[in-house]
Regions:
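C-terminal output helix
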Residues: 107-117
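Receiver (REC) domain active-site loop signature in two-component systems and cognate sites
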Residues: 58
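Acidic catalytic/metal-coordinating carboxylates
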Residues: 5, 35-39, 62-65
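Short amphipathic alpha-helix used as the core "switch/output" element in two-component signaling
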Residues: 42, 64-75
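CheY-like receiver
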Residues: 122-152
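Short hydrophobic/Thr-rich beta-strand motif most characteristic of the beta2 strand and flanking loop
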Residues: 28-35, 43
Length: 152
């Protein structure tokens, strides 16, 4: 079985958050869930998260503000917006800020799972490219510091 991503679910509506977290866990995901943007950012600094699923309209930090912070500090994390906020401007802004996708509530659970798996595939491919680039950079540095006859 393919490794499943570690998820962070952010939604201020506790019944919705708990129900979705429970269902995702039953599907096999490891899920952390919080009710505020500030709690989410604190958790992101402490934990390894692969994918964030966040609402947009929340007290304190909005989902868009959370997305901006993630893009600034946690580039390797994919973000799926899952919201009842259906304005086209929010969708466009989310995508411009770097969201992987934008899903409307109510949603089809199976479709969300497909989007999670797609986002995780994109994340893994990007992580592999970054690792190869870092290895190439290290090899280039080693080669440039080496000269014939020099003992290392």
């Amino acid at each position: 079985m393919e490794h499943l991503p570690r998820l962070l679910l952010i939604d201020d509506e506790e019944p919705f958050r708990e129900t979705l977290a429970k269902r995702l866990k039953e599907t096999g995901y490891e899920v952390l869930d919080v009710g505020s943007g500030m709690d989410a950012l604190t958790l992101l600094d402490r934990e390894k998260i692969d994918i964030v699923i966040t609402d947009i309209q929340m007290p304190g930090l909005s989902g868009l503000e959370i997305l901006s912070e993630i893009r600034a500090k946690h580039i390797g994390v994919e973000v799926i917006m899952l919201t009842g906020h259906g304005e086209v401007s929010s969708t466009v802004e989310s995508m411009h800020l770097g969201a992987y996708d934008y899903l409307m509530k109510p949603y089809e659970y199976e479709y969300l799972v497909v989007k999670i798996q797609e986002a995780y595939r994109v994340k893994r491919e990007r992580d592999q490219r970054l690792k190869k680039a870092e290895e190439r950079s290290l090899l280039d540095k080693l080669e440039s510091s080496w000269s014939p006859g020099r003992r290392i």
